[in-house]
């Protein structure tokens, strides 16, 4: 029997166990530069553990996913957080899972708007980038440095995601 995962809207409250939702709110804004710029302050705090580690910025260009889509694996980064902020203004899917004894529990799927990003905390199980509709660019804050910062898990039975309603 095929196990389809429910897609829910991305909210700060629902995503808290996994990391931060990166989005502007009136409470995050303050004026700088003589009132000419709105700064949305401290939306997330990237992590980079280990000697010689640092936070770097990258641009990832993701191909749109085809649906229904099979979730057969997840990954996590034990030494650093990883954030994805869309530059193309398009929605994307975010797939995360709680840890269950060193493996991912049942995945949860969130639909992020084109003006929302996410920061996965260290050690949070997640599925690779899932753009929708078209090729999409993302600004990614990631850890660079010595040590193995990637762990993958492959499910015995995959989960499925139906095409989201946008």
UniProtKB/Swiss-Prot annotation:
Known partners and oligomeric status: Homodimer.
Entry keywords, A to Z: Lyase, Purine metabolism
Superkingdom per UniProt: Bacteria
InterPro entries in UniProt: RmlC_Cupin_sf, UAH_cupin, Ureidogly_lyase, Ureidogly_lyase_bac, Ureidoglycolate_lyase_dom_sf
Protein name: Ureidoglycolate lyase
Function field: Catalyzes the catabolism of the allantoin degradation intermediate (S)-ureidoglycolate, generating urea and glyoxylate. Involved in the utilization of allantoin as nitrogen source.
Family indicated by similarity: Belongs to the ureidoglycolate lyase family.
Catalyzed reactions per annotation: (S)-ureidoglycolate = urea + glyoxylate
EC code(s) of this entry: 4.3.2.3
Cofactors demanded by this protein: Ni(2+)
Pfam families the record matches: Ureidogly_lyase
GO molecular function: ureidoglycolate hydrolase activity; ureidoglycolate lyase activity
Pathway listed: Nitrogen metabolism; (S)-allantoin degradation
Gene Ontology BP annotations: allantoin catabolic process; purine nucleobase catabolic process
